[in-house]
Amino acid sequence: MDKEKDYFQEDGDLQEILGRFENMLNQLGASFFDVYEFERIIDHYLDSNHFTKAIDAVKFGIDQHPGSATLLMKEAQIYAEKGESSKALEMVRSLEKIEESNNELYMLKGMILNQLGRVNEAESAFDKAVSLSFENLDDILYDIALSFEFVNQYKIALRYLEKAHRRNPKKLNILYDIAYCYDRLHDFDRSIGYYERYLDREPYSENVWYNLGLLYYKKENFQKAVECCDFAIAINDQYASAVFNKANAQANLGEYEEAVKTYKESIQLEPENVLAHCYLGESLEKLEAYSEAIEWYRKSTEIDPSYAEAWYGIAVCYLFMKSYQDALYYAGKAISLDEENPDFWFTLGNVHAHLGAHTDAMKAYAKTTELDPYDDEAWLNLAHLSYLQGETAKAISILKDAYSYTFDIPEVNFYLAAYHYKLHKTDQALKFFEKGLKLDHTAYIAVRKISPDMLDEPRFKDLLKKYFPSWTSRKRN
Protein backbone atom coordinates (compact mmCIF):
# COMPACT_ATOMS: atom_id res chain seq x y z
CA MET A 1 0.00 0.00 0.00
CA ASP A 2 2.83 2.40 0.84
CA LYS A 3 4.43 1.70 -2.55
CA GLU A 4 1.09 2.43 -4.22
CA LYS A 5 0.81 5.73 -2.36
CA ASP A 6 4.37 6.61 -3.37
CA TYR A 7 3.56 5.87 -7.01
CA PHE A 8 0.49 8.11 -7.07
CA GLN A 9 2.35 10.82 -5.16
CA GLU A 10 5.19 10.66 -7.69
CA ASP A 11 2.76 10.72 -10.61
CA GLY A 12 0.99 13.72 -9.11
CA ASP A 13 4.30 15.50 -8.65
CA LEU A 14 5.20 14.86 -12.29
CA GLN A 15 1.88 16.25 -13.51
CA GLU A 16 2.45 19.41 -11.47
CA ILE A 17 5.99 19.77 -12.89
CA LEU A 18 4.76 19.19 -16.45
CA GLY A 19 1.97 21.71 -15.96
CA ARG A 20 4.43 24.39 -14.88
CA PHE A 21 6.75 23.56 -17.78
CA GLU A 22 3.93 23.64 -20.37
CA ASN A 23 2.86 27.04 -19.01
CA MET A 24 6.41 28.29 -19.42
CA LEU A 25 6.51 26.99 -23.02
CA ASN A 26 3.28 28.87 -23.69
CA GLN A 27 4.79 32.02 -22.15
CA LEU A 28 2.35 31.97 -19.26
CA GLY A 29 5.04 32.65 -16.70
CA ALA A 30 8.61 31.78 -15.80
CA SER A 31 9.46 28.80 -13.60
CA PHE A 32 12.60 27.36 -12.13
CA PHE A 33 13.27 23.60 -12.21
CA ASP A 34 16.17 21.73 -10.71
CA VAL A 35 18.19 19.30 -12.85
CA TYR A 36 16.29 16.26 -11.55
CA GLU A 37 12.96 17.86 -12.51
CA PHE A 38 14.25 18.59 -16.00
CA GLU A 39 15.34 14.94 -16.27
CA ARG A 40 11.81 13.82 -15.40
CA ILE A 41 10.29 16.23 -17.93
CA ILE A 42 12.67 15.06 -20.68
CA ASP A 43 12.09 11.36 -19.89
CA HIS A 44 8.33 11.91 -20.02
CA TYR A 45 8.55 13.42 -23.50
CA LEU A 46 10.97 10.72 -24.68
CA ASP A 47 8.63 7.99 -23.46
CA SER A 48 5.86 9.47 -25.61
CA ASN A 49 8.18 10.18 -28.60
CA HIS A 50 7.67 13.95 -28.33
CA PHE A 51 11.22 14.75 -29.39
CA THR A 52 10.65 18.44 -30.11
CA LYS A 53 9.33 19.07 -26.62
CA ALA A 54 12.17 17.00 -25.17
CA ILE A 55 14.71 19.21 -26.97
CA ASP A 56 12.86 22.32 -25.76
CA ALA A 57 13.15 20.98 -22.21
CA VAL A 58 16.90 20.44 -22.66
CA LYS A 59 17.37 23.98 -23.97
CA PHE A 60 15.47 25.51 -21.06
CA GLY A 61 17.36 23.23 -18.69
CA ILE A 62 20.77 24.27 -19.98
CA ASP A 63 19.73 27.94 -19.83
CA GLN A 64 18.91 27.46 -16.14
CA HIS A 65 21.81 25.09 -15.43
CA PRO A 66 24.67 26.02 -17.80
CA GLY A 67 27.21 23.25 -18.29
CA SER A 68 25.07 20.54 -16.64
CA ALA A 69 26.60 17.27 -17.82
CA THR A 70 23.39 15.45 -16.95
CA LEU A 71 21.32 17.64 -19.27
CA LEU A 72 23.93 17.57 -22.04
CA MET A 73 23.83 13.77 -21.84
CA LYS A 74 20.03 13.92 -22.08
CA GLU A 75 20.40 15.99 -25.24
CA ALA A 76 22.65 13.32 -26.76
CA GLN A 77 20.13 10.65 -25.71
CA ILE A 78 17.32 12.52 -27.48
CA TYR A 79 19.26 12.65 -30.75
CA ALA A 80 20.13 8.97 -30.40
CA GLU A 81 16.48 8.04 -29.91
CA LYS A 82 15.53 10.25 -32.86
CA GLY A 83 17.88 8.16 -34.99
CA GLU A 84 20.53 10.87 -35.32
CA SER A 85 23.19 8.61 -33.85
CA SER A 86 26.23 10.29 -35.42
CA LYS A 87 25.24 13.66 -33.98
CA ALA A 88 24.61 12.03 -30.60
CA LEU A 89 28.06 10.41 -30.69
CA GLU A 90 29.74 13.78 -31.37
CA MET A 91 28.02 15.21 -28.28
CA VAL A 92 29.12 12.29 -26.14
CA ARG A 93 32.73 12.62 -27.30
CA SER A 94 32.71 16.30 -26.34
CA LEU A 95 31.40 15.36 -22.91
CA GLU A 96 34.08 12.69 -22.45
CA LYS A 97 36.69 15.44 -22.13
CA ILE A 98 35.04 16.80 -18.98
CA GLU A 99 33.19 13.71 -17.68
CA GLU A 100 35.81 11.01 -18.16
CA SER A 101 34.79 9.15 -14.99
CA ASN A 102 31.02 9.23 -15.60
CA ASN A 103 29.79 5.64 -16.02
CA GLU A 104 26.41 6.77 -17.41
CA LEU A 105 28.16 8.64 -20.20
CA TYR A 106 29.95 5.46 -21.31
CA MET A 107 26.69 3.51 -21.10
CA LEU A 108 25.12 6.04 -23.44
CA LYS A 109 28.15 5.93 -25.72
CA GLY A 110 27.94 2.14 -25.94
CA MET A 111 24.27 2.25 -26.86
CA ILE A 112 24.90 4.86 -29.56
CA LEU A 113 27.80 2.84 -31.01
CA ASN A 114 25.53 -0.21 -31.15
CA GLN A 115 22.99 1.84 -33.08
CA LEU A 116 25.76 2.69 -35.55
CA GLY A 117 26.70 -0.99 -35.89
CA ARG A 118 30.12 -0.45 -34.32
CA VAL A 119 29.78 -3.40 -31.99
CA ASN A 120 33.42 -3.81 -30.93
CA GLU A 121 33.68 -0.13 -29.99
CA ALA A 122 30.39 -0.45 -28.11
CA GLU A 123 31.86 -3.30 -26.07
CA SER A 124 34.84 -1.17 -25.14
CA ALA A 125 32.59 1.70 -24.06
CA PHE A 126 30.41 -0.61 -21.98
CA ASP A 127 33.42 -2.24 -20.35
CA LYS A 128 34.63 1.25 -19.41
CA ALA A 129 31.21 1.94 -17.88
CA VAL A 130 31.42 -1.28 -15.85
CA SER A 131 34.91 -0.40 -14.60
CA LEU A 132 33.55 2.94 -13.34
CA SER A 133 30.49 1.40 -11.65
CA PHE A 134 30.45 0.37 -8.01
CA GLU A 135 26.74 -0.15 -7.33
CA ASN A 136 23.93 -2.14 -8.98
CA LEU A 137 26.39 -3.91 -11.27
CA ASP A 138 23.90 -6.67 -12.07
CA ASP A 139 21.43 -4.06 -13.37
CA ILE A 140 24.14 -2.33 -15.39
CA LEU A 141 25.30 -5.60 -16.94
CA TYR A 142 21.69 -6.46 -17.74
CA ASP A 143 21.12 -3.09 -19.46
CA ILE A 144 24.27 -3.64 -21.52
CA ALA A 145 23.00 -7.06 -22.57
CA LEU A 146 19.68 -5.54 -23.66
CA SER A 147 21.56 -3.10 -25.89
CA PHE A 148 23.28 -6.00 -27.66
CA GLU A 149 20.04 -7.96 -27.90
CA PHE A 150 18.46 -4.96 -29.61
CA VAL A 151 21.04 -5.20 -32.42
CA ASN A 152 20.83 -9.04 -32.57
CA GLN A 153 24.26 -9.60 -31.01
CA TYR A 154 23.09 -12.48 -28.82
CA LYS A 155 26.49 -14.07 -28.14
CA ILE A 156 27.84 -10.80 -26.78
CA ALA A 157 24.62 -10.21 -24.83
CA LEU A 158 25.06 -13.62 -23.21
CA ARG A 159 28.51 -12.71 -21.92
CA TYR A 160 27.07 -9.78 -19.97
CA LEU A 161 23.98 -11.71 -18.88
CA GLU A 162 26.09 -14.53 -17.48
CA LYS A 163 28.17 -12.02 -15.51
CA ALA A 164 24.96 -10.48 -14.20
CA HIS A 165 23.63 -13.93 -13.32
CA ARG A 166 26.77 -14.77 -11.34
CA ARG A 167 26.30 -11.57 -9.34
CA ASN A 168 22.59 -12.10 -8.79
CA PRO A 169 21.49 -15.68 -9.56
CA LYS A 170 17.99 -15.07 -8.19
CA LYS A 171 17.01 -12.30 -10.59
CA LEU A 172 14.32 -13.68 -12.88
CA ASN A 173 14.62 -11.17 -15.72
CA ILE A 174 18.27 -12.19 -16.17
CA LEU A 175 17.33 -15.88 -16.37
CA TYR A 176 14.59 -15.01 -18.86
CA ASP A 177 16.93 -13.13 -21.17
CA ILE A 178 19.62 -15.81 -21.01
CA ALA A 179 17.00 -18.33 -22.13
CA TYR A 180 15.82 -15.94 -24.85
CA CYS A 181 19.35 -15.43 -26.22
CA TYR A 182 20.05 -19.17 -26.36
CA ASP A 183 16.76 -19.60 -28.21
CA ARG A 184 17.78 -16.96 -30.76
CA LEU A 185 21.11 -18.77 -31.19
CA HIS A 186 19.22 -22.04 -31.80
CA ASP A 187 20.73 -23.64 -28.71
CA PHE A 188 17.32 -24.93 -27.68
CA ASP A 189 18.46 -27.31 -24.95
CA ARG A 190 20.27 -24.58 -23.02
CA SER A 191 17.33 -22.25 -23.51
CA ILE A 192 15.00 -24.89 -22.07
CA GLY A 193 17.33 -25.34 -19.10
CA TYR A 194 17.21 -21.65 -18.18
CA TYR A 195 13.46 -21.40 -18.61
CA GLU A 196 13.11 -24.42 -16.32
CA ARG A 197 15.29 -22.67 -13.73
CA TYR A 198 12.98 -19.69 -14.01
CA LEU A 199 9.94 -21.91 -13.43
CA ASP A 200 11.58 -23.49 -10.40
CA ARG A 201 11.36 -20.04 -8.80
CA GLU A 202 8.19 -18.76 -10.45
CA PRO A 203 6.01 -21.68 -11.63
CA TYR A 204 3.04 -19.46 -12.48
CA SER A 205 4.63 -17.55 -15.34
CA GLU A 206 2.33 -18.15 -18.30
CA ASN A 207 4.80 -16.51 -20.70
CA VAL A 208 7.66 -18.79 -19.70
CA TRP A 209 5.48 -21.90 -20.04
CA TYR A 210 4.45 -20.63 -23.46
CA ASN A 211 8.06 -19.97 -24.52
CA LEU A 212 9.02 -23.42 -23.29
CA GLY A 213 6.24 -24.86 -25.44
CA LEU A 214 7.58 -23.02 -28.48
CA LEU A 215 11.04 -24.45 -27.86
CA TYR A 216 9.72 -28.00 -27.67
CA TYR A 217 7.78 -27.27 -30.86
CA LYS A 218 11.02 -26.22 -32.58
CA LYS A 219 12.63 -29.44 -31.36
CA GLU A 220 9.63 -31.32 -32.83
CA ASN A 221 8.75 -32.69 -29.40
CA PHE A 222 5.11 -31.88 -29.99
CA GLN A 223 3.76 -33.80 -27.01
CA LYS A 224 5.86 -31.71 -24.62
CA ALA A 225 4.81 -28.60 -26.52
CA VAL A 226 1.16 -29.46 -25.86
CA GLU A 227 1.87 -30.03 -22.15
CA CYS A 228 3.65 -26.66 -21.78
CA CYS A 229 0.85 -24.83 -23.57
CA ASP A 230 -1.63 -26.56 -21.25
CA PHE A 231 0.22 -25.13 -18.23
CA ALA A 232 0.15 -21.65 -19.77
CA ILE A 233 -3.59 -21.98 -20.47
CA ALA A 234 -4.26 -23.29 -16.95
CA ILE A 235 -2.69 -20.10 -15.58
CA ASN A 236 -4.49 -17.86 -18.10
CA ASP A 237 -7.37 -19.40 -20.04
CA GLN A 238 -7.51 -16.29 -22.27
CA TYR A 239 -3.96 -16.80 -23.52
CA ALA A 240 -4.77 -16.90 -27.23
CA SER A 241 -1.23 -17.58 -28.48
CA ALA A 242 -0.88 -20.59 -26.18
CA VAL A 243 -4.19 -22.03 -27.38
CA PHE A 244 -3.21 -21.49 -31.03
CA ASN A 245 0.20 -23.12 -30.64
CA LYS A 246 -1.28 -26.02 -28.70
CA ALA A 247 -3.49 -26.66 -31.73
CA ASN A 248 -0.44 -26.49 -34.03
CA ALA A 249 1.36 -29.08 -31.90
CA GLN A 250 -1.70 -31.36 -31.89
CA ALA A 251 -1.90 -31.12 -35.68
CA ASN A 252 1.77 -32.08 -35.94
CA LEU A 253 1.06 -35.10 -33.74
CA GLY A 254 -1.62 -36.16 -36.21
CA GLU A 255 -4.30 -35.56 -33.56
CA TYR A 256 -6.50 -33.72 -36.04
CA GLU A 257 -9.80 -34.10 -34.21
CA GLU A 258 -8.27 -32.56 -31.07
CA ALA A 259 -6.57 -29.90 -33.17
CA VAL A 260 -9.93 -28.93 -34.72
CA LYS A 261 -11.42 -28.38 -31.26
CA THR A 262 -8.43 -26.34 -30.11
CA TYR A 263 -8.32 -24.20 -33.26
CA LYS A 264 -11.99 -23.38 -32.68
CA GLU A 265 -11.14 -22.30 -29.12
CA SER A 266 -8.34 -20.16 -30.56
CA ILE A 267 -10.75 -18.51 -32.99
CA GLN A 268 -13.15 -17.70 -30.15
CA LEU A 269 -10.30 -15.80 -28.48
CA GLU A 270 -8.98 -14.25 -31.71
CA PRO A 271 -11.79 -14.10 -34.30
CA GLU A 272 -9.55 -12.37 -36.86
CA ASN A 273 -6.68 -14.89 -36.68
CA VAL A 274 -6.31 -15.79 -40.35
CA LEU A 275 -3.83 -18.59 -39.63
CA ALA A 276 -6.13 -20.29 -37.12
CA HIS A 277 -8.94 -20.39 -39.70
CA CYS A 278 -6.61 -21.74 -42.38
CA TYR A 279 -4.97 -24.37 -40.15
CA LEU A 280 -8.40 -25.47 -38.93
CA GLY A 281 -9.30 -25.99 -42.57
CA GLU A 282 -6.12 -27.99 -43.07
CA SER A 283 -6.88 -30.25 -40.08
CA LEU A 284 -10.38 -30.91 -41.45
CA GLU A 285 -8.80 -31.63 -44.84
CA LYS A 286 -6.58 -34.26 -43.16
CA LEU A 287 -9.77 -35.78 -41.70
CA GLU A 288 -11.18 -35.85 -45.26
CA ALA A 289 -13.98 -33.50 -44.21
CA TYR A 290 -13.42 -31.53 -47.39
CA SER A 291 -16.64 -29.51 -47.54
CA GLU A 292 -16.22 -28.27 -43.97
CA ALA A 293 -12.53 -27.61 -44.63
CA ILE A 294 -13.46 -25.42 -47.60
CA GLU A 295 -15.79 -23.38 -45.36
CA TRP A 296 -12.96 -22.56 -42.96
CA TYR A 297 -10.50 -21.86 -45.77
CA ARG A 298 -13.08 -19.43 -47.21
CA LYS A 299 -13.42 -17.69 -43.84
CA SER A 300 -9.65 -17.28 -43.84
CA THR A 301 -9.81 -15.58 -47.27
CA GLU A 302 -12.59 -13.29 -46.02
CA ILE A 303 -10.31 -12.07 -43.23
CA ASP A 304 -7.34 -11.67 -45.59
CA PRO A 305 -8.10 -12.02 -49.32
CA SER A 306 -4.36 -11.87 -50.08
CA TYR A 307 -3.54 -14.98 -48.01
CA ALA A 308 -2.55 -17.40 -50.77
CA GLU A 309 -2.32 -20.53 -48.58
CA ALA A 310 -6.07 -20.44 -47.88
CA TRP A 311 -6.93 -20.29 -51.59
CA TYR A 312 -4.50 -23.15 -52.13
CA GLY A 313 -6.23 -25.18 -49.40
CA ILE A 314 -9.54 -24.80 -51.24
CA ALA A 315 -7.87 -26.01 -54.45
CA VAL A 316 -6.47 -29.10 -52.71
CA CYS A 317 -9.88 -29.98 -51.24
CA TYR A 318 -11.56 -29.69 -54.64
CA LEU A 319 -8.79 -31.84 -56.12
CA PHE A 320 -9.48 -34.58 -53.56
CA MET A 321 -13.22 -34.20 -54.28
CA LYS A 322 -12.43 -34.64 -58.01
CA SER A 323 -13.99 -31.25 -58.77
CA TYR A 324 -11.14 -30.48 -61.13
CA GLN A 325 -12.50 -27.28 -62.71
CA ASP A 326 -13.02 -25.76 -59.26
CA ALA A 327 -9.57 -26.95 -58.23
CA LEU A 328 -8.13 -25.33 -61.36
CA TYR A 329 -9.71 -21.97 -60.53
CA TYR A 330 -8.50 -21.90 -56.92
CA ALA A 331 -5.00 -23.14 -57.73
CA GLY A 332 -4.76 -20.31 -60.25
CA LYS A 333 -6.00 -17.87 -57.62
CA ALA A 334 -3.29 -19.01 -55.17
CA ILE A 335 -0.58 -18.69 -57.83
CA SER A 336 -1.77 -15.19 -58.77
CA LEU A 337 -1.02 -14.19 -55.16
CA ASP A 338 2.25 -16.11 -54.79
CA GLU A 339 4.01 -17.15 -57.99
CA GLU A 340 7.08 -18.45 -56.16
CA ASN A 341 5.46 -21.29 -54.19
CA PRO A 342 6.41 -24.66 -55.74
CA ASP A 343 3.56 -26.50 -53.96
CA PHE A 344 1.01 -24.34 -55.75
CA TRP A 345 2.50 -25.14 -59.15
CA PHE A 346 2.74 -28.85 -58.34
CA THR A 347 -0.95 -28.98 -57.44
CA LEU A 348 -1.81 -27.04 -60.60
CA GLY A 349 0.14 -29.67 -62.54
CA ASN A 350 -1.86 -32.46 -60.87
CA VAL A 351 -5.14 -30.72 -61.72
CA HIS A 352 -4.16 -30.28 -65.37
CA ALA A 353 -3.07 -33.93 -65.51
CA HIS A 354 -6.47 -35.06 -64.20
CA LEU A 355 -8.16 -32.88 -66.82
CA GLY A 356 -6.02 -34.49 -69.53
CA ALA A 357 -4.25 -31.21 -70.32
CA HIS A 358 -0.82 -32.83 -70.40
CA THR A 359 1.01 -29.91 -72.00
CA ASP A 360 -0.25 -27.52 -69.32
CA ALA A 361 0.54 -30.09 -66.64
CA MET A 362 4.11 -30.39 -67.90
CA LYS A 363 4.54 -26.61 -67.83
CA ALA A 364 3.34 -26.54 -64.23
CA TYR A 365 5.62 -29.42 -63.18
CA ALA A 366 8.56 -27.76 -64.97
CA LYS A 367 7.88 -24.55 -63.03
CA THR A 368 7.78 -26.59 -59.81
CA THR A 369 11.22 -28.05 -60.50
CA GLU A 370 12.55 -24.60 -61.37
CA LEU A 371 11.41 -23.29 -57.97
CA ASP A 372 12.36 -26.43 -56.06
CA PRO A 373 14.80 -28.71 -57.90
CA TYR A 374 14.65 -31.21 -55.01
CA ASP A 375 10.95 -31.97 -55.62
CA ASP A 376 11.33 -35.54 -56.86
CA GLU A 377 7.58 -36.03 -57.40
CA ALA A 378 7.46 -33.12 -59.82
CA TRP A 379 10.42 -34.51 -61.78
CA LEU A 380 8.84 -37.99 -61.87
CA ASN A 381 5.47 -36.64 -63.02
CA LEU A 382 7.12 -34.46 -65.67
CA ALA A 383 9.11 -37.41 -66.98
CA HIS A 384 6.13 -39.76 -66.93
CA LEU A 385 3.96 -37.38 -68.93
CA SER A 386 6.71 -37.27 -71.57
CA TYR A 387 6.75 -41.07 -71.56
CA LEU A 388 2.95 -41.20 -71.97
CA GLN A 389 3.32 -38.94 -75.01
CA GLY A 390 5.69 -41.49 -76.53
CA GLU A 391 8.86 -39.57 -75.70
CA THR A 392 10.72 -42.12 -73.59
CA ALA A 393 14.15 -40.69 -74.42
CA LYS A 394 12.94 -37.27 -73.25
CA ALA A 395 11.67 -38.85 -70.01
CA ILE A 396 15.17 -40.24 -69.42
CA SER A 397 16.72 -36.86 -70.22
CA ILE A 398 14.43 -35.12 -67.71
CA LEU A 399 15.36 -37.50 -64.89
CA LYS A 400 19.05 -37.28 -65.75
CA ASP A 401 18.80 -33.47 -65.53
CA ALA A 402 17.25 -33.97 -62.11
CA TYR A 403 19.73 -36.60 -60.97
CA SER A 404 22.15 -34.29 -59.15
CA TYR A 405 19.21 -33.35 -56.88
CA THR A 406 17.37 -36.67 -56.76
CA PHE A 407 20.05 -39.39 -57.01
CA ASP A 408 19.14 -40.69 -53.55
CA ILE A 409 15.43 -41.15 -54.35
CA PRO A 410 14.74 -44.85 -55.05
CA GLU A 411 11.75 -44.16 -57.34
CA VAL A 412 13.87 -41.93 -59.59
CA ASN A 413 16.32 -44.78 -60.09
CA PHE A 414 13.55 -47.32 -60.70
CA TYR A 415 11.85 -45.04 -63.25
CA LEU A 416 15.18 -44.57 -65.04
CA ALA A 417 15.63 -48.34 -65.05
CA ALA A 418 12.16 -48.88 -66.51
CA TYR A 419 12.55 -46.20 -69.19
CA HIS A 420 15.94 -47.56 -70.25
CA TYR A 421 14.47 -51.05 -70.43
CA LYS A 422 11.72 -49.73 -72.71
CA LEU A 423 14.44 -48.53 -75.07
CA HIS A 424 16.17 -51.95 -74.84
CA LYS A 425 19.13 -50.45 -72.96
CA THR A 426 19.30 -53.32 -70.53
CA ASP A 427 22.74 -52.62 -69.07
CA GLN A 428 21.70 -49.07 -68.14
CA ALA A 429 18.42 -50.40 -66.79
CA LEU A 430 20.29 -52.88 -64.58
CA LYS A 431 22.57 -50.14 -63.27
CA PHE A 432 19.70 -47.91 -62.14
CA PHE A 433 17.65 -50.88 -60.92
CA GLU A 434 20.48 -51.93 -58.60
CA LYS A 435 20.93 -48.36 -57.35
CA GLY A 436 17.24 -48.24 -56.52
CA LEU A 437 17.40 -51.56 -54.66
CA LYS A 438 20.34 -50.35 -52.60
CA LEU A 439 18.33 -47.30 -51.54
CA ASP A 440 15.06 -49.10 -50.79
CA HIS A 441 14.45 -52.58 -52.14
CA THR A 442 10.73 -52.44 -51.31
CA ALA A 443 10.18 -49.56 -53.76
CA TYR A 444 10.97 -51.75 -56.79
CA ILE A 445 7.24 -52.05 -57.59
CA ALA A 446 7.53 -48.58 -59.20
CA VAL A 447 8.79 -50.30 -62.36
CA ARG A 448 5.50 -52.18 -62.77
CA LYS A 449 3.85 -48.91 -63.78
CA ILE A 450 6.14 -48.69 -66.83
CA SER A 451 7.88 -52.01 -67.60
CA PRO A 452 6.28 -54.85 -65.62
CA ASP A 453 7.89 -57.47 -67.88
CA MET A 454 11.30 -56.31 -66.58
CA LEU A 455 10.73 -58.35 -63.46
CA ASP A 456 10.55 -61.56 -65.50
CA GLU A 457 14.08 -61.05 -66.82
CA PRO A 458 16.62 -63.37 -65.06
CA ARG A 459 19.19 -60.64 -64.37
CA PHE A 460 16.61 -58.40 -62.71
CA LYS A 461 15.33 -61.38 -60.71
CA ASP A 462 18.86 -62.10 -59.53
CA LEU A 463 19.24 -58.52 -58.29
CA LEU A 464 15.91 -58.75 -56.48
CA LYS A 465 17.01 -61.96 -54.75
CA LYS A 466 20.30 -60.31 -53.77
CA TYR A 467 18.79 -57.19 -52.18
CA PHE A 468 15.34 -58.53 -51.31
CA PRO A 469 15.81 -62.10 -50.01
CA SER A 470 12.12 -62.62 -49.30
CA TRP A 471 11.12 -61.61 -52.82
CA THR A 472 11.09 -65.15 -54.28
CA SER A 473 8.83 -66.61 -51.60
CA ARG A 474 6.58 -63.55 -51.77
CA LYS A 475 6.32 -64.04 -55.51
CA ARG A 476 5.13 -67.66 -55.07
CA ASN A 477 2.46 -66.64 -52.58
Language-model regions, residue ranges each:
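Position-specific recognition of the canonical hydrophobic site in helix A of tetratricopeptide repeat
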Residues: L46, A80, N114, E149, ...
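TPR/TPR-like (Sel1-like) alpha-helical repeat modules
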Residues: A418-I445, F468-P469
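Structural marker of alpha-solenoid helical repeat scaffolds
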Residues: Q64, K97-E99, L132-S133, R167, ...
